Amino acid sequence: MNLYDTHTMKRGAILVDVCGYTGEEDFYAMHKIIDEVIKPEDSGFSVDSMCIGGYFNKDGILVRTSSESPYDGLSFFYEPAKMSAEDVKKIEDWIETVVKELHDRLPR
């Protein structure tokens, strides 16, 4: 099983689905890892009746997070067209780090 699947949307935005993790508790665990390991300057999330939407901002780079995706799993979302190649690489590395840590802490 892949740790995550990456999808390019019609306008070039990237959606990264975290394989095997869904719902609120997994989302909270993911955000705890983001705060502890990535150490963003700012992060947060809000809960409504449909999903949890969140974000983190590090080095001036915004990455959005969600518990809602095509498969109702955890996801990351970012727009590489508005970023340098170096910033895109940072995001890819952050996602890889968070997802590996999530699998280590909550194996499935």
Residue spans of the language-model regions?
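Negatively charged, low-complexity tracts enriched in Asp/Glu with abundant Ser/Thr
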Residues: 1-49
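Intrinsically disordered, low-complexity regulatory segments enriched in Ser/Thr/Pro
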Residues: 63-89
